[in-house]
Amino acid sequence: MLSVTQRGDAIVFSVRVQPRASRNTIGGEWQGALKVYLTAPPVEDRANESLRRLLAEHLEIPVAAVRILSGGRSRIKRVEVRGTTAQRIRELA
């Protein structure tokens, strides 16, 4: 089950990123984290920006409401989103 934490008016959860995938998509849950496939390479923050855009698109929130808290150089990241609910995050998985 996806581990989602409420922190004030924000939701924090883990994401497992697979860069250089064939398409940008959300692939369910992986060991408590949201599994995300991105076409962008993990170079010059391209994958991180692609992740922010993909999550914002699926959650129908502005890209500015999605922030990577930790793991900027790792496949496993902690992400904070504002303007949505924990239930909505769980539905992505």
Name each model feature, range by range.
Residues M1-R52, H58-V63, R67-R73, K77-A93:
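Contiguous, often N-terminal, cationic amphipathic patches that form binding interfaces
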